[in-house]
């Protein structure tokens, strides 16, 4: 009886530690995102990498998620050398997951996203890499059609490329709205950086399609929700205010 009790206590302690780590990661990725802080993303990713158990799928997926957010910001900042290093690292971890779970939808999606990051490194390969990226994201979506992060990435695959390479901001908006709806239905909006990014991209779609007043209202709503959302306050809201005049 005593041995069973000790095993139970150990299991509870392990579960609590895992939950605390997940909560910390959620808070830290959220903070790095709203502050638009590349260094914070880097430190978080390095720390997560040091603590990752590469035999554990959940641990690997948390690390890949850090690389995903960190590399997204590096790509936006056009830090190409760092992007290239991160792609190599992340793809190595994704390969470990897919070797164990070939139909892991989130890992397949991550593979598609990191392929898309490589487009900025070699424009000559943009058509081939872009097509490969879209195929992977579409495959992930066929496995998990209501996964909000995969819906988000499907939207990104339509938002960022020019029209000649399949870009379509109106279609992107539909996927962003679907992802937003899923997150809100799940009650998962608190300290969720993907949710804030989705709302930001919804507003950017409005701007890109001439709906400037709607964009301005959504940016203002975002700042009401998160006053420290740096890029909205410094860049996107002023642009929308000017465009709406």
Identify the meaning behind each predicted range.
Residues 19-77:
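N-terminal leader/linker segments that initiate helical-solenoid repeat arrays
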Residues 48-62, 93-107, 138-147, 180-193:
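Flexible helix-coil transition and linker loops at the boundaries of alpha-helical arrays
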Residues 31, 66, 73, 114, ...:
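Residue-level signature for tetratricopeptide repeat
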Residues 55, 62, 82, 103-106, ...:
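Structural signature of alpha-solenoid helical repeat junctions
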